């Protein structure tokens, strides 16, 4: 068995194991290349310190910091708590960053759902929350539960554009599958493409923040209320044939290199998606190893093109089923690959998941023509997130 090293855009990736992807009917079986030097968690993982406080527009922070930095962060936290205490939970938000060109905001993220709040009639209050990926645009509006339909949503979305002086977006992402009909119809009336996707990272984290700062302080707040429209987590299905690669590997990339990949994504890759690491508060040490999955394919460009339309949001090593699970859209889960369940493969999968947790859920997917090649055809930065509390 040979030793392989996967490379992403000139950065050496610590390859744990190269495994064949399952083959569709009639396709030849590919070879298996196992690393002769499996990486153990103790040698390879750098665990970040406790999360530091959020800045006013930052949803959360994952960092490694000194005691001096921690002290300064604590002072900032005190100031932010004081500011949060002044928030009126019944006020609505209508904000556009004055330093941002309104024409540059071409994609929105939205949620339209009930909140754990009762109005004067004793009925649940609904809320529209709209933002962009950088939180340069922020808009909220409350609605009574008897006014929930596509016309209400259409008019509210149009009012976002009018109130903030921004054009209607090209695309709107949303993460609740139960609202797909209403959202798609409302967006369609406005000539906007509605995209079901859990890549609404800024929105999801903003909702978590609003639960703590706004909803829980509202006079009508109902503690312990379960979300009316919970997120789906369906059983994974068979991977479509056009998404098959040849083999894959658990890999790791230093955080400094991940930043470089994200910063150069538009310049170097036709396919892929990044995340705003600064906004999300990822301030890990440059040497912190971020886990990922590298996929080799002899038809890497077509594969990356197909993957690019999936709204990929996460990958998971399911050690119980000895499978690699790909999550996409809002409620789509595929068995991307199975692998032989052994003590060694289970340990590698567990170490990979532990590395994700240590990095605050950050991980990536890279598609290459060859695991030994210098460069990627596609690169997606992914993030594990818990479901929002509302």
Swiss-Prot record:
Annotated transit peptide: 1-69
Transmembrane regions: none
Biased composition (Low complexity): 61-75
Effect of gene knockout: Pale green leaf phenotype.
Keywords: Chloroplast, Plastid, Transit peptide
Single annotated GO MF: phosphatidylinositol-4,5-bisphosphate phospholipase C activity
Organism: Zea mays
Region described as Disordered: spans on this chain: 16-85
Protein's gene: TAB2
Top-level taxon in the UniProt lineage: Eukaryota
Name of this protein: Protein TAB2 homolog, chloroplastic
Protein purpose: Nuclear genome-encoded factor involved in the biogenesis of photosystem I (PSI). Required for the accumulation of PSI during plant development. Does not seem to be required for the translation of mRNAs of the PSI subunits.
Localisation per UniProt entry: Plastid, Chloroplast
Any one of the GO BP annotations: intracellular signal transduction
